[in-house]
């Protein structure tokens, strides 16, 4: 904490011995040690609190950026869904070309390829041998 060498501590001790006196020096040293220990613990606690706050702040920033990402993703999904719904609502139902010719001529249309028409007729289902 402080950069005090051993010789400087000796000088401080001698000055304290002369100023305070030998009777009160042990009690003053104990009190000074007690307050010095409390100050160290207080400083360590403040350091821990600051580190926790910095970590919490970085976690809050991360959480906020994640919320922004999720919100933007949801907005893009909703906009795409709305576009699809608008497209589905505005497009008319497609009418097959053969049916549209039949409607225009007012009659039935004959299949162009009779062989294809014959092959498209369903066959009779097989009956099981009972």
From Swiss-Prot:
Keywords: Cell inner membrane, Cell membrane, Membrane, Protein transport, Translocation, Transmembrane, Transmembrane helix, Transport. It is found in: Cell inner membrane. One of its GO terms (cellular component) is TAT protein transport complex. The chain crosses the membrane at residues 1-21. One of its GO terms (molecular function) is protein transmembrane transporter activity. One of its GO terms (biological process) is protein transport by the Tat complex. Residues 80-89, 96-111 have a biased composition (Basic and acidic residues). The keyword Phosphoprotein does not apply. It is a single-pass membrane protein. The keyword Iron-sulfur does not apply. Its main location: membrane. InterPro entries: TatA/B/E (IPR003369), TatB (IPR018448). Gene3D superfamilies: 1.20.5.3310. Residues 70-130 are annotated as: Disordered. The Tat system comprises two distinct complexes: a TatABC complex, containing multiple copies of TatA, TatB and TatC subunits, and a separate TatA complex, containing only TatA subunits. Substrates initially bind to the TatABC complex, which probably triggers association of the separate TatA complex to form the active translocon. Belongs to the TatB family. HAMAP family: TatB (MF_00237). Part of the twin-arginine translocation (Tat) system that transports large folded proteins containing a characteristic twin-arginine motif in their signal peptide across membranes. Together with TatC, TatB is part of a receptor directly interacting with Tat signal peptides. TatB may form an oligomeric binding site that transiently accommodates folded Tat precursor proteins before their translocation. NCBIfam families: tatB (TIGR01410). This is Sec-independent protein translocase protein TatB. It comes from Nitrosomonas eutropha (strain DSM 101675 / C91 / Nm57).
């Amino acid at each position: 904490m402080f950069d005090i060498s051993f010789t400087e501590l000796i000088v401080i001790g001698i000055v304290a011995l002369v100023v305070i006196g030998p009777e009160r020096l042990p009690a003053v040293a104990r009190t000074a040690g007690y307050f010095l220990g409390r100050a160290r613990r207080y400083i360590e606690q403040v350091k821990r609190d600051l580190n926790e706050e910095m970590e919490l702040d970085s976690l809050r920033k991360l959480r906020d950026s994640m919320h922004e990402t999720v919100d933007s993703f949801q907005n893009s999904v909703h906009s795409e869904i709305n576009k699809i719904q608008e497209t589905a609502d505005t497009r008319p139902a497609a009418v097959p070309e053969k049916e549209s010719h039949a409607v225009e001529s007012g009659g039935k249309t004959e299949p162009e390829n009779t062989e294809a028409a014959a092959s498209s007729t369903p066959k009779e289902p097989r009956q099981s041998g009972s």
